[in-house]
C-alpha cells in the first residue's frame, strides 16, 4: 500500500461523520499519520493564500505540517480532533446555506413590495445581520448571476451531512432541513452546477 509508517495522509475534503471515523481508523490500522484539515475559502482565496484550515490531529503533526498549510492559508485553527474539524466545517456551512436562503427570502419580499434590491442591500449594510457573505452574494443574486463559486450540488451534499450530524445528536433542525429541501428542488431541476445562491430562483420564477 502507498500509505504506511512514515507516511502522512491529509484530508481537505468536506466529508461526513462516518467517513471521518473511517479515515481515522484506517490510518491507525496502516500506521500512517492522519490530519483532517477541511478549509473555508474559495479558489480565489487559495490563490491569495487566504484560506482558513480547521486542523484536527496530533499537535506535533500539525506543527510539522504548518509550513505546508501556510502556503495557502492566513490561519490554521487547531481543533480538538479530526471529527471536530469535520463538525466545525459542516456547521459553519450550515450558517452559510441558511444565510443565503434567508437573503433570498428577504430579497423576494422586498421585490414583491416594490422595493429595489439595492435599497434592501443598502439597508443591510449598517445592520447587525450584515456579513461578508451577504456582500458577496447579494448583488449577484439581485442580478440573477449564479456563476459558481460554491456549487449547489456541493452545498446540498454538505447539508445532508449536517442533517446526519443533527440526527446522531437527537436534534431537530428545521431551518437547515427546509433549506436542504429547497436546494434539492433546484438540483432536481438540473441546476446543481450553478452557485448555491440559485436558491433565490425559487422566488424569481413565481
Per-region residue spans from a language model:
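Short, conserved loop/helix-junction motifs that constitute active-site signature segments
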Residues: 1-5
Amino acid at each position: 500500500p502507498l500509505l504506511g509508517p512514515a507516511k502522512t495522509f491529509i484530508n481537505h475534503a468536506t466529508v461526513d461523520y462516518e467517513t471521518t471515523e473511517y479515515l481515522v481508523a484506517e490510518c491507525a490500522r496502516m500506521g500512517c499519520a492522519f490530519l483532517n484539515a477541511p478549509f473555508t475559502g474559495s479558489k480565489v482565496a487559495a490563490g491569495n493564500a487566504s484560506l482558513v484550515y480547521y486542523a484536527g490531529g496530533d499537535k506535533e503533526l500539525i506543527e510539522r505540517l504548518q509550513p505546508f498549510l501556510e502556503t495557502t492559508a492566513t490561519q490554521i485553527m487547531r481543533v480538538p480532533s479530526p471529527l471536530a474539524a469535520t463538525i466545525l466545517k459542516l456547521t459553519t456551512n450550515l450558517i452559510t446555506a441558511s444565510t443565503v436562503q434567508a437573503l433570498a427570502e428577504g430579497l423576494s419580499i422586498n421585490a414583491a413590495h416594490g422595493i429595489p434590491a439595492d435599497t434592501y442591500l443598502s439597508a443591510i449594510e449598517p445592520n447587525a445581520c450584515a456579513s461578508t457573505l451577504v456582500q458577496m452574494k447579494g448583488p449577484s443574486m439581485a442580478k440573477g448571476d449564479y456563476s459558481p463559486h460554491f456549487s449547489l450540488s456541493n452545498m446540498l451534499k454538505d447539508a445532508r451531512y449536517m442533517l446526519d450530524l443533527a440526527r446522531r445528536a437527537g436534534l431537530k433542525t428545521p431551518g437547515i432541513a427546509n433549506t436542504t429541501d429547497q436546494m434539492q428542488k433546484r438540483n432536481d431541476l438540473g441546476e446543481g452546477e450553478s452557485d448555491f445562491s440559485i436558491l433565490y430562483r425559487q422566488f424569481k420564477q413565481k
